[in-house]
Amino acid sequence: MARVTVQDAVEKIGNRFDLVLVAARRARQIQTGGKDPLVPEENDKYTVIALREIEEGLINNQILDVRDRQEQQEQEAAEIQAVTAIAEGRR
């Protein structure tokens, strides 16, 4: 199944080099970033899960960029709130 997934995923992304980058980025998110897979895991490795997500059109580079920006903004907002709370506590 992985071979078919790779061919279909290449068609979704455009070329195999970008596919490698997007799939690796997504697999890393699933493995270490605490991101939940968007497809059933079915005992697959993280890279295969990432390829299946790409094949189904659930993940691409733009989607990953938007999600990363949203997370960064949320993290920055939380940091600002923490600094504000500390500053108000010193008054």
From Swiss-Prot:
Pfam families: RNA_pol_Rpb6
E.C. no: 2.7.7.6
Subunit field text: The RNAP catalytic core consists of 2 alpha, 1 beta, 1 beta' and 1 omega subunit. When a sigma factor is associated with the core the holoenzyme is formed, which can initiate transcription.
GN (gene name): rpoZ
Catalytic activity: RNA(n) + a ribonucleoside 5'-triphosphate = RNA(n+1) + diphosphate
NCBIfam families: rpoZ
Presence of keyword Transferase: yes
GO BP annotations, alphabetical order: DNA-templated transcription
InterPro entries per UniProt: DNA-dir_RNA_pol_omega, Pol_omega/Rpo6/RPB6, RPB6/omega-like_sf
GO cellular component: DNA-directed RNA polymerase complex
Protein function: Promotes RNA polymerase assembly. Latches the N- and C-terminal regions of the beta' subunit thereby facilitating its interaction with the beta and alpha subunits.
Similarity annotation: Belongs to the RNA polymerase subunit omega family.
Species classification: Bacteria, Pseudomonadati, Pseudomonadota, Gammaproteobacteria, Enterobacterales
Single GO MF descriptor: DNA-directed RNA polymerase activity
Keywords: DNA-directed RNA polymerase, Nucleotidyltransferase, Transcription, Transferase
Keyword set includes Transferase: yes
SMART domains the UniProt entry points to: RNA_pol_Rpb6
Name of the protein this chain belongs to: DNA-directed RNA polymerase subunit omega
